């Protein structure tokens, strides 16, 4: 019986205790993205924005989303009402704005504007990860080919 209780407690802590790893500034997140060979999910947000709060509380807090982001992405959230810095080229009117950047800090696509639910975000994350990996493989192939 003790064993089942311990297993249950482990699962509860593991599933509900997971935290999203969020970088503290834009430049450091690009450096980490490059070092880890992972894409960067960069969110422009505000504490007073209804949809920003919804995105964080209802989507980014889901265990499956946290696990996927922590495993396959580097995450940075810039709060414009806190004065968090990021390049002007990524500013768009309206928040939240979700960007996916390659490990060189270049946009992989146009941003997602507004909140997104768990199911759709997980689909987007899979798509972005696949595209990132394909681009990395192509770069490696071109590099190898140029050495021949």
Question: What is the meaning of each model-derived region?
Answer:
Residues 17-36, 129-148:
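N-terminal leader/targeting and pre-domain segments
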Residues 94-136, 140:
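Non-catalytic, surface beta->alpha helical segment in thiol-disulfide oxidoreductase systems
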Residues 26-61:
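Local sequence-structure signature of Cys/Sec-based thiol-disulfide redox active-site neighborhoods
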Residues 46-50, 58-59, 80-84, 93, ...:
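Solvent-exposed loop/turn segments at secondary-structure junctions
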Residues 36-40, 71-78, 103-106, 122:
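Loop/turn elements at helix/coil->beta-strand transitions in domains of secreted/extracellular proteins
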Residues 34-35, 67-70, 90-94:
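Extracellular/periplasmic catalytic domains that process cell-envelope and extracellular macromolecules
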Residues 4-13:
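Sec-dependent N-terminal signal peptides
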Residues 20-24, 62-84:
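Thiol-based oxidoreductase modules, predominantly thioredoxin-like and allied folds used
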